[in-house]
A protein has these predicted regions:
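Short beta-strand segments at enzyme active-site cores
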Residues: 48-49, 117-120, 228
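A generic, well-ordered mixed alpha/beta core segment in the N-terminal half of proteins
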Residues: 91, 95-152
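Glycine-rich anion-binding loops and their surrounding alpha/beta cores
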Residues: 2-20, 26-27, 75-78, 99, ...
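Core alpha/beta catalytic barrel or barrel-like domain that forms the active/cofactor pocket
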Residues: 82-90, 118-124, 185-192
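Acidic, glycine/proline-rich low-complexity segments that act as flexible tails and inter-domain linkers
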Residues: 2-98, 113, 269-271
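Alpha-helical scaffolding segments of alpha/beta enzyme cores, especially the outer helices
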Residues: 34, 68, 72, 108, ...
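Short glycine-rich loop/turn motifs that provide flexible caps or phosphate-binding loops at active sites
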Residues: 23, 41, 59, 90-93, ...
């Protein structure tokens, strides 16, 4: 009597995956991780990888899928050590407002006030300057070993984690995303994948519809305390031009509320001033 081993067929699995996407089915947390593993295995040509991104975008990413994608990317990133109370101040970008890099300015102010900040960022996409553009202009060396950044966070209370150094998996998708020229699930993943594995964040998103879902994703990923914010003016920031929509994650619960500049004792500003 002979037995026949059941051998996994990645190409067949990939075809089944793409059929599921074409039919509008959701993948869930584990399904998304499996999908990205298949797509990164070398068997998927760029056109299939692009079709996957578009299929998920057209249907709309679920919180479970975003969570699964973040887990996959986190499992493949280079990590750095940081104190338990470290925070990140970061945004998705993509708000097309053309403002200066507010989160980097906020990082400097927060660190000066005593917060421990492990700032994660990259170059500009739609703003006048990305975090790395600003810091490079200030003379900060970006391409330093993780141990140096870890020491800066511990000793100075602030360090910058330049995304390309810590996320080799993102590089394979970069030309595909550039060719598409559209927002995809990857626009959400950078802010969710801080190499210092912080559990406290202020995270700006480019759409009001993402505020509470991303707070839910952070809860699933183990964040302890976070604000997810979006300005009524379209900014992925706490805005000074009007209302900011906030979802606060704290101790496992999520609270939604609105803030105005007046709540913080600030005058209203304009987009042009920013």
């Amino acid at each position: 009597m002979t037995t026949t081993a059941i051998v996994a067929n990645p190409a067949r699995e990939l075809k089944h995956l793409m059929n599921s996407i074409a039919e509008g089915q959701t993948l869930g947390d584990e399904g998304m991780q499996k999908a990205l593993d298949l797509l990164m295995s070398g068997i998927a040509p760029p056109v299939v990888m692009g079709a996957f991104l578009m299929g998920v975008r057209v249907r709309g990413e679920t919180t479970e899928e975003i969570t699964g994608a973040a887990k996959f990317m986190r499992s493949r990133m280079t990590t750095v050590d940081a104190p338990p109370g470290a925070i990140d101040i970061v945004g998705t970008g993509g708000d097309s407002r053309g403002t200066y890099n507010i989160s980097t300015a906020a990082t400097i102010v927060a660190a000066g006030a005593g917060a421990i900040v492990a700032k994660h960022g990259n170059r500009a996409v739609t703003s006048l300057s990305g975090a790395s553009d600003v810091l490079a202009a200030l003379g900060v060396k970006l391409d330093v070993p993780p141990v140096v950044v870890s020491r800066a966070i511990a000793d100075a209370g602030v360090g910058f984690l330049w995304a390309p150094l810590y996320h080799p998996t993102f590089k394979a998708w970069a030309p595909i995303r550039a060719d598409l020229g559209l927002r995809t699930i990857f626009n959400l993943l950078g802010p969710l994948c801080n190499p210092a594995q912080v559990t406290r964040q202020v995270l700006g998103v480019y759409s009001r519809n993402l505020v509470e879902p991303i707070a839910e994703v952070l809860r699933k990923l183990g964040s302890f305390h976070a604000w997810v914010v979006h300005g009524a003016d379209g900014m992925d920031e706490l805005t000074t031009t009007g209302v900011t929509y906030v979802a606060e994650l704290k101790d496992g619960d999520i609270y939604a509320f609105e803030l105005t500049p007046e709540d913080a004792g600030l005058p209203r500003s304009t987009i042009e001033a920013l």
